[in-house]
Amino acid sequence: MNKKQKVIVSLLKEIDEICRQNNIMYYLSPRLTLCAVTEQPFPQNPLFGVVLMKVEDMERFRRLIEEDPREKRALESMKSHKWFPGFYLRYENTDTICINLDRTRDYEYPGIGVNIFPLRTSSVSGTAKSRISRAENGWTQLCDINQTECGYKNRINRTLMRLQCLINGRQRQASRLYERFCREFQGEGAEQYILRRRKQTLTFPAEIFAGTKTVTLEGEEFQVPAGTEEYLTICYGNNYREIQEARYVIPSSMIVSARVSYAQFWKEEGNYEKYCKERQKNSRRLVKARKYKKYFNECWKYVVLCGARMNLGIFYKSRKDYIMNLYKNEDYMALEKVFRPYYRMTEKSLQKGELFAEDVEIFDIYVDTLEKTGRTVQRSKISSLI
């Protein structure tokens, strides 16, 4: 193992010791459980240090660490940091550095750490679940300044959350959201537990987490769910033993080191706060530039379509006499063959909510040909626009 992996294992071991001393149940993440069960090496990705806890246990763990903080360690959450990106905890080694330069404000102490994700109960009422879901979505959207795509509902949730932050203050709003989350999603007698991540949501039967068993990972003992096989099957499928760890390459936007602390690094490199502000400005400019680029690309595609439509219109005008003659003779088979390019161009125009009618007489002949040859789908689309 390299030094970064050793730091993560040491943090996992500290979490294990704290939980055992205080009767708190925790479980290794599916990825780490897979590595332990299949005897694969510890993941290279520094973000794969993850454990799971039930919501009430996670809150107990947070309070224990706050009451008895450890040297060169930090526990972050929405309760303590107004830019924290979600409903989870992060236990960090402050003598290291692990920072995404595109998300510089996510953590107050950007060191190598272990994320503690909550197992949510499914017994929450529909109204409360919907309310928390909207709030979580709004908070996530507000924290992710680099997001390029944002749907209508996401924009509404983000706007409402921004207004609430302006009224209550961002730190107070973050703390309220976290407290409401803990209050709503904890409770005994749950039939299912839900693990919600940024890109994936998994649902587990409660029996899986009824107890724990011990596994060995890199020479250290950790806890995993008693129903390990079902746990891994839900996450990775029946062939989970065949899954191999992909080769990991640190992205250019990441700085990861176990040899130097984030404070020392920025002391040598320059003003951290100033750098974060400049980086955020550049990120916003980049997001705007991408939006403009997408808009200009769509405009250019429309210009190309209009040019192709104009050229095809000129072509059909040059063959107008021939088309009129076929129409007088009611030769619809020949007309259908002649109008094939016209049909394709009409389809493209209808996608834009427009008609391809460069010449009215030719267009009328084309519509009549559609009706006579049984192409009623496009005929009905044209009728809705006329």
For the regions a language model picked out, list residue spans one by one.
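Boundary/linker segments of alpha-helical solenoid repeat arrays
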Residues: M310, M345-F356, I386
